[in-house]
Amino acid sequence: MPYRTVQQDQGYFEGVVTVTNRTSVPLSAWQLSFSYPGAQVRMVWGGVLVQAGSQVIIRNDPLTGSIPPGGTFVVKFGAGGVPSLPRGCRFGGRECGFTP
């Protein structure tokens, strides 16, 4: 799953994760979880922040609709700390990985 830091200031950064629907049906509900050692996620755009901090859970926002088969969706988050590659990625209950 592609990840990149899009903004960085002293003690604060914003990251972007691109979610791709690799199934043959629209994806109307999803959950992304990951750990972020050395950072505290505080806000999210493009999803609902269920659990903040260094152990993060983000769910789809019902108002954004579904992701079509083969389609992508961007989730952006703001965090305090030092940016790095998040770990322990799980999407829809399955292990995934982040790529820079």
Language-model regions: role of each:
Residues M1-T5:
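Boundary/junction segments of secreted and surface-exposed precursor proteins
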Residues V6-G11, L49-I57:
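Short, ordered beta-strand-loop transition motifs
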Residues V19-T23:
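Asparagine-centered strand-capping/turn motif at beta-strand->loop junctions
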Residues P26-G53, G92-G93:
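Short acidic, flexible loop segments centered on an aromatic residue
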Residues A52-G80:
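Structured beta-strand segments within beta-sheet-rich domains
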